[in-house]
């Protein structure tokens, strides 16, 4: 997630009353370390303000790691039924669609978890290099494409967020690497070549801008899900 993407999402959540927002399900949450140390702006802009409001947030991921409240896969019907019983009012689904081979099926499942009037916050890369964590389908949807992934919803807000290039990012967005260190790494392809390819794929963004798509959707009363 980009820093400005986290800020945008946090600002939109702040506008929604507690009774309409909570409980919130953070789908594909990753770990506490990732949210607070690897990308601390996620905690700062999204989850710390939500916690200050006293709302319930469930972090769901397939990884049984610290900071994951619910471990499982929504493609498992029994697990999906368990999550449905939690009666969440909103879902955050960030940086997840491009990891899914059957994203349309998962999107239908996510919509089915929400009541009519429930909120869905969706964001992900628009212009971004390949991210093999563990896979990347290179799905880089526009605003309209994201909306079409969730039939039975209407759009409340949307943006293409310009995260700038390498020179504009903070240390967390650079993965802890300085520009000088990155240039030096590009000069040593013979050392750990798999890691070198990761850096090489990102190198155009020393000049090009990373962008993200973000939308806020609400489930219709007449939704088929």
Predicted regions and their residues:
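Class I SAM-dependent methyltransferase Rossmann-like catalytic core
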Residues: 1-21
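Short, conserved clusters of charged catalytic residues that mark active-site
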Residues: 4-8, 41-42, 105, 141
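Short secondary-structure capping/turn segments at boundaries of alpha-helices and beta-strands
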Residues: 12-14, 45-46, 202
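Short, flexible hinge/linker loops that cap or flank conserved catalytic cores
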Residues: 18, 51, 207-208
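S-adenosyl-L-methionine-dependent nucleic acid methyltransferase catalytic domains
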Residues: 18-21, 88, 115, 136-138, ...
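Conserved SAM-binding loop
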Residues: 22-132, 147, 217
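S-adenosyl-L-methionine-dependent methyltransferase catalytic module, highlighting the catalytic core
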Residues: 101-109, 119-225
């Amino acid at each position: 997630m980009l820093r400005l993407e986290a800020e945008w999402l946090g600002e939109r959540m702040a506008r929604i009353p507690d009774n309409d927002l909570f409980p919130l399900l953070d789908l594909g949450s990753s770990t506490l370390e990732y949210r607070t140390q690897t990308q601390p702006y996620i905690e700062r802009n999204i989850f710390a303000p939500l916690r200050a409001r006293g709302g319930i947030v469930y972090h769901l991921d397939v990884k049984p790691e610290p900071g994951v409240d619910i471990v499982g896969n929504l493609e498992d019907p029994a697990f999906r039924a368990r999550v449905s019983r939690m009666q969440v009012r909103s879902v955050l689904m960030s940086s997840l669609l491009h990891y899914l081979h059957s994203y349309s099926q998962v999107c239908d499942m996510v919509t089915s978890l929400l009541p009519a009037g429930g909120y869905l916050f969706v964001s992900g890369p628009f212009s971004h290099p390949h991210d093999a964590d563990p896979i990347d389908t290179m799905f880089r949807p526009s605003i309209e494409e994201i909306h079409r992934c969730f039939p039975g919803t209407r759009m409340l807000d949307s943006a293409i967020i310009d995260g700038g290039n390498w020179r504009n990012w903070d240390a967390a967005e650079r993965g802890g690497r300085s520009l000088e260190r990155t240039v030096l790494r590009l000069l040593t392809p013979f050392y750990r070549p798999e890691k070198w390819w990761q850096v090489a794929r990102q190198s155009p963004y020393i000049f090009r801008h990373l962008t993200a798509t973000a939308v806020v959707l609400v489930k219709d009363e007449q939704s088929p899900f």
